[in-house]
Amino acid sequence: DYSYLNRCAVDQKTMDELLFDQNGRSVFKDVCPLVASLISSQLEKNNINPNDVSKFWLHQANGKMIRLIASKVLNKDDFDPSLIPMPIKQFGNLASVGSLFAFNLNNDLNPGDKGVICSFGAGYSVCSIIVEKI
């Protein structure tokens, strides 16, 4: 179970060794709290209440992950679904570009509104940025 890619020469590896394989359940259990913690910490450091964020454009891994991360950040399960645009329903998992794709399709903030763009992926890497429309 590798959670990262290995640099490898094709002539020295079998086809099974060249494949990228993750245990979906463990990724879900590990990544959701990690991403929620990063976003929450970032908002706290910038004195932003999570409930004051107008949109969360998250990596489009799957709907369950997106909803769980948002519910952990917002500390509630009953939030407006428009807070977390999910083009994954129409376009599937777009890998690293998923959060930016969601942002591009749903960039409807008003001046002064804040949002969070967050991507995560292979190797349990996570990055996040807070944006504010001016």
Model-identified regions with their sequence ranges:
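Broad hydrophobic/π-residue packing in well-ordered secondary structure
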Residues: K55-F56, F91, V126, K133
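Short Gly/Pro-enriched loop/turn and capping motifs at secondary-structure junctions
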Residues: N62-K64, F91, D108, Y124
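Short alpha-helical patches at coil-to-helix transitions and adjacent helical residues
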Residues: C32, G63, N93-L100
